[in-house]
C-alpha cells in the first residue's frame, strides 16, 4: 500500500511584530517573494536568504580583514617633516590613556567589539549547524547587536576627518583603507542577507507554524507565532516562549517606564554635550575649543558646506529630533492621541534608522586624536562634552529599542 505524502497547509498565521495583526502568509515563499503586513506594511517573512555556509564565509572574510582595518594606518599626516599614522585602534588607545577612558570605551564597543562579535556569532551558527547544537543564545544576541555595529558610520567619519585635518597639514590615504572599506561593505552585506527568521526555523523545526487565528501569541525576542496551548513555564513558573525561553509577561507599564528612564537620561546628558567643548586644538600653545555647533560653523567658514551639513545632521539635528519624536510618541500613548497612525510609524522607523549615525562625531574625535598630537607645536584634545554626547546617543538608542510600537496600534484599535 503506497504511503500518503503529508503536506503542510498552503497558508500559515504570522502575528505582526509591529501592529499585532494576525496575517495569513504562504507557508513556502519563493526566493523572489516576501510577505508584508497589509495594515502597517512591516516585513513579516522573506524568501530571500543566503545559505548559512555562504554567510559564514563572509563572516570569516570580515575577521581576516579586521586586523588590517583596525591596527594598520588608514590615514597619514605629514606635519613638519614627520609622518603620523592614524588607525582605529591607535585613536581609541590615545583617547583612553589621555584621560578619556569612558569615551574611548564607548567607541571601542561600537567600532571594535560589536563588529567582531557579529562576525563571530555568524561563524558560531555555522559550527552549531555542523555539530547539531541548538544556538538559542547566539540567535537572540544576533538580533540585539545589529544596531550597534557601526563600521559604516566610521567610514563616513573618516571622510569628515580628511576635510577637518587638511587645514593643518598634508594628508595621505594609505592602502589599508581598502580592507577597511571592504570590511564595512561585507558587514553591511551580511546584515542584508542574514535572515534570522529563517535561521530560527532551521534550527528549531520542531516549533511548528500556526494555522488558526484563535488564541495566538507572539514572542517579542524571536518573533515566533504560537498558540496559547504551547506556552511554557520556567523554573519560577513564569510564562516564557516555547522556542527561545524569553519571558512573555512584560507589562506595558514596565516597557513605558524603561523607555522614559533612558529617554530622560539622554535628555539630561544632551545639555552638557551641547554646552561644553567637545574638542580642542593647541596651536603654538594657544587652545582653541569647539562645541558641537561651533565645529559646524568652522566647517562653513572654511567652505566645506557638505561636511558641515553631515556633521550638523548627525551630531545636532538627529539627537535633538530623536528626543522630540520619542516625546511625541510617548505623549500619544499616554494621552491616547489618535493622529495619523502611518505617520507615527514612519517617525518611529526614522528614529530607529538614523539614531546610530549620531556616533559620527565621536569617531571623528578618535581619528583626530591619533593624527594631530605633536607636543608643543600642535596638539588635539578631547573636550568634556564628548562623554556626555556619547552617553546621550547610547541612552536615546536604548530608549528607542525599548519602545513598543504595538502601544500606538492599541490606541488605534481601541478607537475602532
Swiss-Prot record:
GO biological process, one term: membrane organization
Superkingdom as given in the UniProt entry: Bacteria
Localisation: Cell inner membrane
InterPro entries: PqiA-like, PqiA-like_proteobact, PqiA-PqiB_transport
Disulfide bonds: none
UniProt membrane topology term: Multi-pass membrane protein
Pfam families the record matches: PqiA
Gene Ontology CC entries for this record: plasma membrane
Main subcellular location: membrane
Alphabetical keyword list: Cell inner membrane, Cell membrane, Membrane, Transmembrane, Transmembrane helix
Transmembrane segments: 62-82, 107-127, 138-158, 172-192, 263-283, 306-326, 347-367, 377-397
Homology family: Belongs to the PqiA family.
Name under which the protein is recorded: Probable intermembrane transport protein HI_1671
Organism: Haemophilus influenzae (strain ATCC 51907 / DSM 11121 / KW20 / Rd)
Amino acid at each position: 500500500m503506497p504511503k500518503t505524502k503529508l503536506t503542510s497547509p498552503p497558508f500559515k498565521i504570522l502575528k505582526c511584530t509591529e501592529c499585532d495583526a494576525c496575517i495569513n502568509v504562504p507557508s513556502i515563499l519563493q526566493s523572489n517573494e516576501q510577505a508584508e503586513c497589509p495594515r502597517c506594511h512591516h516585513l513579516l517573512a522573506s524568501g530571500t536568504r543566503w545559505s548559512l555556509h555562504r554567510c559564514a564565509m563572509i563572516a570569516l572574510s570580515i575577521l581576516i580583514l579586521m586586523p588590517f582595518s583596525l591596527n594598520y594606518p588608514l590615514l597619514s599626516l605629514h606635519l613638519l617633516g614627520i609622518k603620523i599614522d592614524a588607525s582605529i585602534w591607535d585613536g581609541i588607545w590615545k583617547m583612553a590613556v589621555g584621560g578619556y577612558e569612558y569615551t574611548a570605551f564607548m567607541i571601542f564597543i561600537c567600532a571594535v567589539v560589536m563588529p567582531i562579535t557579529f562576525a563571530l556569532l555568524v561563524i558560531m551558527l555555522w559550527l552549531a549547524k555542523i555539530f547539531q547544537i541548538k544556538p538559542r543564545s547566539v540567535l537572540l544576541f544576533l538580533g540585539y547587536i545589529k544596531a550597534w555595529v557601526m563600521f559604516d558610520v566610521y567610514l563616513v567619519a573618516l571622510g569628515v576627518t580628511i576635510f577637518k585635518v587638511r587645514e593643518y597639514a598634508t594628508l595621505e590615504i594609505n592602502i589599508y583603507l581598502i580592507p577597511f572599506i571592504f570590511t564595512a561593505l561585507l558587514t553591511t552585506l551580511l546584515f542584508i542577507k542574514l535572515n534570522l527568521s529563517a535561521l530560527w526555523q532551521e534550527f528549531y523545526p520542531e516549533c511548528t507554524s500556526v494555522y488558526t487565528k484563535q488564541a495566538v501569541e507572539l514572542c517579542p525576542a524571536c518573533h515566533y507565532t504560537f498558540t496559547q496551548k504551547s506556552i511554557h513555564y520556567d523554573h519560577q513558573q513564569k510564562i516564557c516562549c516555547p522556542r527561545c525561553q524569553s519571558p512573555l509577561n512584560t507589562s506595558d507599564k514596565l516597557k513605558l517606564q524603561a523607555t522614559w528612564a533612558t529617554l530622560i537620561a539622554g535628555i539630561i546628558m544632551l545639555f552638557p554635550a551641547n554646552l561644553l567643548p567637545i574638542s580642542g586644538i593647541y596651536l603654538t600653545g594657544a587652545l582653541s575649543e569647539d562645541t558641537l555647533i561651533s565645529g559646524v560653523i568652522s566647517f562653513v567658514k572654511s567652505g566645506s558646506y557638505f561636511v558641515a551639513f553631515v556633521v550638523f545632521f548627525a551630531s545636532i539635528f538627529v539627537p535633538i529630533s530623536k528626543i522630540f519624536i520619542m516625546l511625541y510618541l510617548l505623549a500619544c500613548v499616554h494621552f491616547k492621541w489618535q493622529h495619523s497612525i502611518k505617520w507615527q510609524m514612519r517617525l518611529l522607523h526614522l528614529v530607529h534608522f538614523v539614531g546610530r549615525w549620531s556616533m559620527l562625531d565621536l569617531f571623528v574625535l578618535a581619528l583626530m586624536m591619533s593624527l594631530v598630537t605633536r607636543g608643543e607645536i600642535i596638539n588635539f584634545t578631547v573636550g568634556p562634552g564628548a562623554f556626555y554626547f556619547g552617553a546621550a546617543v547610547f541612552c536615546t538608542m536604548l530608549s528607542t529599542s525599548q519602545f513598543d510600537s504595538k502601544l500606538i496600534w492599541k490606541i488605534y484599535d481601541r478607537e475602532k
